[in-house]
């Protein structure tokens, strides 16, 4: 069954590939839209303390819906990640100075990373056949919350990390799977959700949508970590 990933993130591309299922990628900028979402989507959104427009599951739905509307692939997966600290949304930094400001706020503190997932399970409609309840897409929505604690960081350490360029395209201005992992002291919850795609939840949602033959998500997580040259964080044992 054909799977389309509605995301430009190379981290999500890589994580999904470790589940061993073939997929194609279609990218839109739909997550930035202000168009009202259907009532059935709004009422199905998981509870989240973020502002409505920033709700990661809503943004994931916008990505998946835009792709399905264009392509009507059998299964479309969308995801979006947002960082929150003290009630503030920390998205991707505008520039290096902004990244340094974000990391200064995060240093030595615990913040929450929210990753929303949307899966459309929609068989293509036959030519000339009107949409109906039988052909309407099945929709799955999910929100994963992980708590991340950064180590205390001095200005020189933050500046050196920002100079690598890694923080500039990442929510919260750090990449846990890259050099930014050295700044992390603890993860409570799904590690892969912090990267951008929680593998266990993704596996269950894709299975429900009819995708078969996937790698076990825990095995995929450990294989990915080994490929990265990493081990699970020991305190507490990090979940996939």
Predicted region positions:
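Cofactor-binding loop segments of dinucleotide-utilizing enzymes, especially the Rossmann-like FAD-
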Residues: 8, 28, 122
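Generic preference for hydrophobic
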Residues: 3-5, 25, 119, 148
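N-terminal beta1-alpha1 ligand-phosphate binding loop
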Residues: 1-22
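Glycine-rich, phosphate-binding/catalytic loops in enzymes
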Residues: 21-24, 94-96
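A short beta-strand-loop structural module common to alpha/beta enzyme folds
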Residues: 22-36
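Hydrophobic/basic alpha-helical segments enriched in Actinobacteria
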Residues: 2-3, 27-31, 72-74, 170
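Anionic-ligand binding patches
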Residues: 42-240
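Active-site-proximal loop->helix
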Residues: 18, 37-39
